[in-house]
Amino acid sequence: LLERFLAAAPPPVPRESTQGVVDPVDAPFSGFVFKVQANMDLKHRDRIAFLRICSGRFEAGVDAVVSRTGKTLRLVQPQEFMARERTLTDDAVAGDVVGLHDRGSLRVGDTVAIAGGVEYPGVPRFSPEHFAQVKLDEAMRRKQLDRGLSHLAEEGTILLLFAPSLTG
């Protein structure tokens, strides 16, 4: 079934970027982070950034530039996912999705590319539909609350909004 599905699926299409249209086959490696997920492995506190490859060929161990920060990252131990199974992969091509271990340097919407300057439009953000106010019962746990909320915001799960200060 999967082989027939892959045969019928359309190939990757060129994508619009800040440097014009990027061809998925001829252009050097580039991709964008569309999801960041923490704690996928119950035994470890891991954080996986899911990267959709938009152009070129991805190879394990390649040095790439994160467009938002301009920092160079070495992309090691890329993983492919099938249901609950993880497998290490050495390479991937345009249209593939790989998971990268992340230590907090990647966010949803980041563009990762060998050649700096390429930047894809970010993931659209929608206005929140549900609002909640968080009040802390134990003041000694303020740092834990702040850290937890910031992790959820980095994953794109929540949007943090702060009320303006009433003290001036």
PLM feature spans:
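Structural and coupling elements of P-loop NTPases
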Residues: 1-168
